[in-house]
């Protein structure tokens, strides 16, 4: 196993090989020291946002093959010579290495402290500006008068009552200006009629005016007039709050009256908004026009604060009241969650609280994060319940199982088709070869790392590996007899064992039996009359089957095409126990890779053995080290022989280029171009909106199977990172899945996900049918499960 280690700035990177999943972090530090020349004590290693600590293994951090670990080098501080002070003491600096040395610490720097102290010094001046002087008979509106107060965040006007009037004291460093109005220094302390829980709110004179009390009739409304209307910016057809608006136009028909206005929301304006409630247009009261309103006035209608219960006090509501019981009683005993903004009675919590906690922030049980579960920098990992149940956790064996390629885990996953896909994988021709089983899993041909059959007992088998693990297997190439799984004791994390009991037609055995085009029979088995109508099974042959079959590959794993189950039956195997046998026969249009036609096709397609990324480089480094060690050992042996016997004459060494020049440069194999059907070519021509992309893609036809990879890369959805399904080709020439664009519009994002071009709220999503049709033909079955 090998991984990549890279410095945090990305300038230096090295490959660390000869590792195991059970390699300790402290052992990894020693290997990093050899490559980066950094002492283990100065290394900070990060993987997936976690700081790796000694005492854990790579398996604990789930480090996989060819993953990247970041290295941050701590600063090595040198102790200065102590300087004696006038008081006889000495100034000492802490030599201890800390996380702040690397620039990632939480400690406060001196500059931060000085800046904070400056803020603290300026704080009394800010408070001095906000000092208020209580006076009587101030302002236009007196104590007890009903007014309209504007919420500065929403820009809407709410009904309120004046509780107190004060004057703001002038600032010490700001002389009074003769141009300023006396009303500008007045502060009104008001309470909202509908929101008493907000308490007393301070308002400047610009945000307070006389209570609107006169409605304007339809006949008296004029264009350009500024009035107060009810409007809902989020849902324009519903009742909302009260805003100032300038009338643009009005139109009256026999059945309806339309009023359009520019609604003023704070400093912004919503243009050309249709006002629904045309009978509730209020005149804006100017100062001094009417008598002060000190008696309880008529209330205006506003939109309900809760859309679920419509502010009905008799209804239980878990959205605006207690999220547990839905009751609206005891508001003083409710807590608001600072994360989800839901209310909870203190006696509805489990366990209940006796009183309201004094903390400013409070989180409900669903939003609360248990601090004991958080792994902070420098702390050990918490015990994993999942890994504690693994067989490797309870095994007493000292064997290092972490070096096997079956244990490294997948670095990528096949998403072009779902895991329960029957039939061939698009872009994987017959004869494709992989060095390790984990690569076969990554390609999607056979997903399990170790198991021989991939399937579900209620659906069928999707693929199997013929590896010669059972002595009862018989391989004839175009057909073979496969032995079912089970009947072996694999406790203790074993990969294989001798047959120790009878097999049963359950689990994957039953899944493989379901592929046979015949009714299931748990006792005697069954045989299909029309075997070609059965479900297809992808078959992979492994090099281990070479001991039983001449059709197995010489190296690694090879995809041999589609087979169908002809019959299955139980019989006593060579071990003396009952085993289930399955007869499979090849049903694939592509020739078998062991035939002459198949071998020629493999050459034409340019199919070669596929290795994991970095495998050949790691192998070359290992061979280089072994050759160096062998050369050193030989020199030592030659030196010892020199003292005992005379050296023999050296043979003339070959020139470096002598042998290679005779052979010359190997001839490059010509790859068979990928051929499109007539229907596929016509569909590509119909897709005029993507003609530029197709022109570039069609240049890859000469590369054979790589053409499909080019198509998949070009038509990848930027949202889900998958091949586009039901594609929408936008006006800006980008292709997005319809479902992805629907989710974007539901989130009120009406722009192209790729370039942020404004598509508009009313954008018509039309599926590009020619593109969808050609993708479905190139990648059959890729839309299943999407």
From Swiss-Prot:
Zinc finger extent (PHD-type): 303-370
Positions of the YDG domain: 423-586
Site residues (Required for affinity and specificity for 5-mCpG sequence), renumbered to this chain: 495
Region listing for Histone H3R2me0 binding, in residue ranges: 337-341, 357-359
Record field: catalytic activity: S-ubiquitinyl-[E2 ubiquitin-conjugating enzyme]-L-cysteine + [acceptor protein]-L-lysine = [E2 ubiquitin-conjugating enzyme]-L-cysteine + N(6)-ubiquitinyl-[acceptor protein]-L-lysine
Site feature location: Histone H3K4me0 binding: 320
Residue(s) at site: Histone H3R2me0 binding: 331, 334
Segments of this protein annotated with the region Required for formation of a 5-methylcytosine-binding pocket: 470-473, 482-485
GO cellular component: chromatin; euchromatin; heterochromatin; nucleus; replication fork
UniProt modified residues of type N6-acetyllysine: 403, 550
Region ranges (Required to promote base flipping): 449-450
Cross-link Glycyl lysine isopeptide (Lys-Gly) (interchain with G-Cter in SUMO2) placement: 283, 389, 550, 670
Enzyme Commission numbers on file: 2.3.2.27
Linker: annotated segments: 300-305
Positions of region (Disordered): 82-134, 626-679
Site-annotated residues for Required to discriminate between hemimethylated DNA versus symmetrically methylated DNA: 493
Domain Ubiquitin-like: 1-78
Pathway as given in its UniProt record: Protein modification; protein ubiquitination
Keywords, in A-Z order: Acetylation, Cell cycle, Chromatin regulator, DNA damage, DNA repair, DNA-binding, Isopeptide bond, Metal-binding, Nucleus, Phosphoprotein, Repeat, Repressor, Transcription, Transcription regulation, Transferase, Ubl conjugation, Ubl conjugation pathway, Zinc, Zinc-finger
PANTHER family: E3 UBIQUITIN-PROTEIN LIGASE UHRF-RELATED, E3 UBIQUITIN-PROTEIN LIGASE UHRF1
Subunit structure: Interacts with DNMT3A and DNMT3B. Interacts with DNMT1; the interaction is direct. Interacts with USP7; leading to its deubiquitination. Interacts with histone H3. Interacts with HDAC1, but not with HDAC2. Interacts with BLTP3A. Interacts with PML. Interacts with EHMT2. Binds methylated CpG containing oligonucleotides. Interacts with ZNF263; recruited to the SIX3 promoter along with other proteins involved in chromatin modification and transcriptional corepression where it contributes to transcriptional repression. Interacts with UHRF2. Interacts with FANCD2.
Chain's role: Multidomain protein that acts as a key epigenetic regulator by bridging DNA methylation and chromatin modification. Specifically recognizes and binds hemimethylated DNA at replication forks via its YDG domain and recruits DNMT1 methyltransferase to ensure faithful propagation of the DNA methylation patterns through DNA replication.
Domain topic, free-text comment: The tudor-like regions specifically recognize and bind histone H3 unmethylated at 'Arg-2' (H3R2me0), while the PHD-type zinc finger specifically recognizes and binds histone H3 trimethylated at 'Lys-9' (H3K9me3). The tudor-like regions simultaneously recognizes H3K9me3 through a conserved aromatic cage in the first tudor-like subdomain and unmodified H3K4 (H3K4me0) within a groove between the tandem subdomains.
Name this protein carries in UniProt: E3 ubiquitin-protein ligase UHRF1
Organism: Bos taurus
Gene: UHRF1
């Amino acid at each position: 196993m090998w991984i990549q280690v890279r410095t945090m700035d990305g300038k230096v990177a090295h490959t660390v090989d000869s590792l195991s999943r059970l390699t300790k972090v402290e052992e990894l530090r020693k290997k990093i020291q050899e490559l980066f020349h950094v002492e283990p004590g100065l290394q900070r290693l990060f993987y997936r946002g976690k700081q790796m600590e000694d005492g854990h293994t790579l398996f604990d951090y789930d480090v996989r093959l060819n993953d990247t670990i970041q290295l941050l080098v701590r600063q090595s501080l040198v102790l200065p010579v102590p300087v004696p002070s006038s008081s006889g003491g000495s100034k000492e600096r802490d030599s201890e290495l800390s996380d702040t040395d690397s620039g990632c610490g939480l400690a406060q720097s001196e500059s931060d402290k000085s800046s904070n102290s400056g803020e603290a010094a300026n704080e009394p001046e800010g408070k001095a500006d906000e000092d208020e002087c209580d006076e009587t008979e101030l302002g236009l509106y007196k104590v007890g008068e009903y007014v309209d107060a504007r919420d500065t965040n929403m820009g809407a006007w709410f009904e309120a009552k004046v509780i107190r009037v004060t004057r703001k004291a002038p600032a010490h460093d700001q002389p009074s200006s003769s141009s300023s109005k006396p009303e500008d220094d007045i502060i009104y302390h008001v309470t909202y009629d509908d929101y008493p829980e907000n308490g007393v709110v301070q308002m400047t004179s610009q945000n307070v005016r006389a209570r609107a009390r006169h409605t304007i009739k339809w006949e008296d409304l004029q264009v350009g007039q500024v009035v107060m209307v009810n409007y809902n910016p989020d849902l324009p057809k519903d009742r909302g709050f009260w805003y100032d608006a300038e009338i643009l136009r009005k139109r009256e028909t026999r059945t309806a009256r339309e009023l359009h206005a520019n609604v003023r929301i704070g400093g912004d304006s919503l243009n050309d908004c249709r006002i629904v409630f045309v009978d509730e247009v209020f005149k804006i009261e100017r100062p001094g026009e009417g008598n002060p309103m000190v008696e309880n006035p008529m209330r205006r209608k506003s939109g309900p604060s809760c859309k679920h219960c419509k502010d009905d006090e008799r209804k239980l509501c878990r959205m605006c009241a207690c999220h547990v019981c839905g009751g609206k009683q005891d508001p003083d005993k409710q807590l608001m969650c600072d994360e989800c903004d839901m209310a909870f009675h203190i006696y509805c919590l489990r366990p209940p609280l006796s009183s309201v906690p004094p903390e400013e922030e409070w989180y409900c049980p669903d939003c609360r994060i248990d601090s004991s579960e958080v792994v902070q920098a420098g702390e050990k990992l918490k015990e994993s319940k999942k890994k504690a149940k693994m067989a490797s956790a309870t095994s007493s064996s000292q064997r290092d199982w972490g070096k096997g390629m079956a244990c490294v885990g997948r670095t990528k996953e096949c998403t072009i088709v779902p895991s329960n896909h029957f039939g061939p994988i698009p872009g994987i021709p017959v004869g494709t070869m992989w060095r390790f089983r984990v690569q076969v899993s990554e390609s999607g041909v056979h997903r399990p790392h170790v198991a021989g059959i991939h399937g579900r007992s209620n659906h069928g088998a999707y693929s199997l590996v013929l590896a010669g693990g059972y002595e009862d297997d018989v391989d004839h190439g175009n057909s073979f007899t496969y032995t079912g799984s089970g009947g072996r004791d694999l406790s203790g994390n074993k990969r294989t064992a001798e047959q120790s009991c009878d097999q049963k037609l359950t689990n994957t055995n039953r899944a493989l039996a379901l592929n046979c085009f015949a009714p299931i029979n748990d006792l005697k088995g069954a045989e299909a009359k029309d075997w070609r109508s059965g479900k297809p099974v992808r078959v992979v042959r492994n090099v281990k089957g070479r001991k039983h079959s001449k059709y197995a590959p010489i190296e690694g794993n090879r995809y041999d095409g589609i087979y169908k189950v002809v019959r299955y039956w139980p019989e006593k195997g060579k071990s003396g126990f009952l085993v289930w046998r399955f007869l499979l026969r090849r049903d694939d249009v592509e020739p078998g890779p062991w035939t002459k036609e198949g071998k020629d096709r493999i050459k034409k397609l340019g199919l070669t053995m596929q290795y994991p990324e970095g495998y050949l480089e790691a192998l070359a480094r290992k061979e280089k080290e072994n050759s160096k060690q062998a050369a050193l050992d030989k020199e030592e042996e030659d030196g010892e022989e020199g003292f005992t016997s005379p050296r023999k004459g050296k043979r003339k060494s070959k020139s470096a280029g002598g042998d290679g020049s005779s052979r010359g440069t190997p001839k490059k194999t010509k790859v068979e171009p990928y051929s499109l059907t007539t229907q596929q070519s016509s569909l590509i021509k119909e897709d005029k909106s993507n003609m530029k992309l197709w022109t570039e893609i069609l240049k890859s036809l000469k590369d054979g199977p790589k053409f499909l990879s080019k198509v998949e890369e070009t038509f990848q959805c930027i949202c889900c990172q998958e091949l586009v399904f039901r594609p929408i080709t936008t006006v800006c020439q980008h292709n997005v899945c319809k479902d992805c664009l629907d989710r974007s519009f539901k989130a009120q994002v009406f722009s192209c996900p790729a370039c942020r071009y404004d598509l508009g709220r009313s954008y018509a999503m039309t599926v590009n049918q020619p593109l969808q049709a050609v993708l479905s033909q190139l990648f059959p079955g890729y839309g299943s499960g999407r």
